[in-house]
């Protein structure tokens, strides 16, 4: 996963709106454009950026292009983010244990 490309793709509110629409399932580009009140070329531009970042898949059927979320990408992203939460929680637990140990080993006890 190219984090810089992903963050750049997510930095546009309209792209985040597209992802929200795609949570419900696969949609054709034309319907995405219609729901967002955008021109087809502008919608295609944003969809291409999301595709390049690996956030969506594209499927062509006759004259239509359908898009869907790349859910495995989001699962990997959540796992990557979770590692920082674990580290923070571990540091907090270590700090609590150190305080408890120093309190219990205090000569005043």
Label the predicted regions.
Residues 2-41, 61-73:
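N-terminal helix-turn-helix DNA-binding core of bacterial DNA-binding proteins
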Residues 34, 51-52:
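Alpha-helical residues within the helix-turn-helix
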Residues 32-34, 43, 95-96, 100:
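Terminal low-complexity, poorly structured segments
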Residues 46:
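Residues within the DNA-recognition helix of helix-turn-helix
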Residues 1-2, 73-109:
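Amphipathic alpha-helical dimerization/coiled-coil segments
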Residues 12, 52-53, 66, 89, ...:
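Short amphipathic alpha-helical "recognition" segments used for binding
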């Amino acid at each position: 996963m190219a984090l810089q490309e992903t963050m750049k793709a997510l930095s546009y509110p309209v792209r985040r709106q597209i992802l929200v629409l795609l949570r419900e399932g696969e949609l054709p580009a034309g319907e995405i454009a219609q729901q967002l009140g955008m021109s087809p070329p502008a919608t295609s531009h944003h969809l291409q950026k999301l595709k390049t970042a690996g956030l969506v898949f594209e499927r062509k059927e006759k004259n239509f292009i359908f898009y869907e979320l790349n859910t495995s990408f989001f699962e990997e992203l959540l796992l990557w983010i979770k590692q920082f939460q674990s580290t923070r929680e571990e540091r907090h637990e270590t700090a609590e244990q150190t305080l408890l140990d120093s309190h219990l080993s205090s000569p005043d006890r």
